[in-house]
Amino acid sequence: MAKSQIALCCMSHSPLLNLPGPAQELLDEIDKAIAAARDFVAEFDPELVVTFSPDHYNGFFYRAMPPFCIGTAAEGVGDYGTHEGPLDVPSDLATDCARAVLDHDVDVALSAAMDVDHGTVQPLQKLFGDATAKPVIPVFINSVATPLGPIRRVRALGAAVGAHLATLGKRVLVIGSGGLSHDPPVPTLATAPPAALDRIVRGVPMTTDQRQARQTAVIEAAREFASGRGTLAPLNPDWDRAFLDIVDSGRLAEVDGWDNGWIAEQAGNSAHEVRTWIAAFAALAAQGEYVTENRFYRAAPELIAGFAIRTAVTT
């Protein structure tokens, strides 16, 4: 069997891309960058997609919070107007991937009924128009629910997935979804009120009113943040650019020593979503040296995020 061809697209996500508030100029600039990534993906024409993505207490909860999980079946929950319903997950390929990762000494959970949110489906919809357009293996990386594992294990996960993908004889696109610096209003075990605690621990479904209230709160938090008010940690463009330089230049081993507390202190609690980028780039790097092509970055307070996009192929 011929060796697989692997390509990469990493991009930030934001529910605010689908909500009122951001300036049209900002949305137009991001749409232009996404269009370039979409053209890259269309030209590559993947036969299989592997997503590395976080969750925002929509599919994974403290009742059992794995560091990593591979889905053999998955459904979008439809949050913030994103895709609701099943994804096209090839269960046999996903199971084989999980088995290969375990054989590479990386402990990964398996889900035969994974729920995924905008962190997974928004990039699929932006790149393909439809979240079900391509067969996809979803890989969850806990990036929110502390305590978090060491970054070096994320790189090991990506490398193990990449080593397996190389054996499939397919054109495979790996997607990393999230980041960069940002600190949105996310409940924690220490601070969540009772209703939110029931959700993040037990997965108690949100009512329609609760979902609407959360959406309104996110819009208001972004409005305050963009105007320089509120209590959210500021974006850190310098940190973002330093991280992008690391992935652009293939110096992935440098992240192995990063301290989790340092990441949150420098770039916000949800900056840990860069774990998805690290895993995706590690999967690509398992094929050899690579070069990044489409490069976009903008600090976007209106999205409460340092918003970035990268595409890459092996050389």
UniProtKB/Swiss-Prot annotation:
SUPFAM superfamilies: LigB-like (SSF53213). Catalyzes the non-heme iron(II)-dependent oxidative cleavage of 2,3-dihydroxyphenylpropionic acid and 2,3-dihydroxicinnamic acid into 2-hydroxy-6-ketononadienedioate and 2-hydroxy-6-ketononatrienedioate, respectively. Keywords: Aromatic hydrocarbons catabolism, Dioxygenase, Iron, Oxidoreductase. This is 2,3-dihydroxyphenylpropionate/2,3-dihydroxicinnamic acid 1,2-dioxygenase. GO terms for molecular function: 3-carboxyethylcatechol 2,3-dioxygenase activity; ferrous iron binding. Homotetramer. HAMAP family: MhpB (MF_01653). NCBIfam families: PRK13370.1-4. Its cofactor is Fe(2+). One of its GO terms (biological process) is 3-phenylpropionate catabolic process. It catalyses: 3-(2,3-dihydroxyphenyl)propanoate + O2 = (2Z,4E)-2-hydroxy-6-oxonona-2,4-dienedioate + H(+); (2E)-3-(2,3-dihydroxyphenyl)prop-2-enoate + O2 = (2Z,4E,7E)-2-hydroxy-6-oxonona-2,4,7-trienedioate + H(+).
